[in-house]
Amino acid sequence: MQDFVSISLVYLGIYALSVWSLNLQFGYAGIINFGWIVFQSIGAYFAAVTSIGPVTSHSYQTYIFGSRLAFPLPLIVGTASGAVLAAILGYVVLSRKIRSDFVAVIMLVVAIIALQVVTANVSLFNGANGLSGIPQPFNGILHLSQSGYQWFYVGWLTVICVIVYLGVEWLCKSSWGRSLRAMREDEVLATHLGINVQVLRLVVFIIGGAIAAFSGALLVEFLGAWSPDAWSFVETFVVFVAVYIGGRGNNRGAFLGALLVPVIFGVFPSFLPAFGYPGLSSTLQWVVIALLWLCTFYFRPAGIMPEGRLIVQREGQPDVSSMFRRGWAARRAQRSEAR
């Protein structure tokens, strides 16, 4: 039971980072990134190959860039790889005046091609067999039991999630975040307001890709293995549904979506005993997630926690909202006296 709870909490932390990265791109900037899973996967792969060590004649795995870097360098390399890939793809795709629906299709094609290339080419990351034997950070120093190490990872991941959440919230509530909202609502108007839309889209795409790669690096360091089966392009759909159900443009809502969709309907059923024919439980997971998304789409399109209204006041200007509230209270008082 303890392993069940600790593993579920680890996945909750990973999915929290995942939804925050996608919420930056999709919720705040309006970029439909159907290739999001590629960034998480490249972070996992590069964190893995920089932790395992170089390939030798006795190795049972083949991969590129094999080295054994000291922790936390593998996490840094994995995060940087996601940022570099996002910069390349963002420059190619987002710098052109391509409609958002075409961008979504292009990124989906990129995810499918990347999966096929990594699976078919054994020399990259050991092909369809994937990578295994990835050392877990701190495990050789702390000498904890398996259960103890899992709970240690839960605590460490909680600290990371709090830091990332505070950083993302600070970005989204700053003037930079307001520019993202303006770009999402009307790019033409944002351009006339002096916002460089192309640069802004590229920057938020890089930040989101880096956070996604960081989540993949953290996950592979915990699992100790990674294979192409772990990053099918349909995994992007789960994160999208979590952001949409929780509330796009709201980081707390995105976290709630991560708790509901990937963890409750994704992680929990994997620990339940098998019933029916083989594969029935996994099939029902997708059915429930799809039905949950449809219900949200029809009955609460803004999500469980919708994006709040943003009232901005410049320094030296009167507080219009407080003036309105005082005027409204005065009118109510006059009406009550008249009665």
Model-predicted regions and their roles:
Residues 1-339:
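Transmembrane alpha-helices and adjacent helix-loop boundaries
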